[in-house]
């Protein structure tokens, strides 16, 4: 993931956000919200424009949300817990799908 990034651009700021800084990405109407350990960054973009650049550590949780599996520490009871203490609540079907993807991601990481 090193060297891969998303360009965050607003009227006042242009910033590079590395993939390893991102916990999850979600779409809220016309805005993209990048949730990082330091806070939330919002800007206007379509999630379909940035999703193809994600590597295999990102998992599609819902049509409007992608989770960085490398930042997940625990998944339990419909809640995704990240290493920094932040959480994300998912519906039952989405949680089960992401939990399965997370398990497969961990197995691939061990084998590498």
List PLM regions with ranges.
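Basic, polyanion-interacting recognition surfaces, primarily
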Residues: 1-112
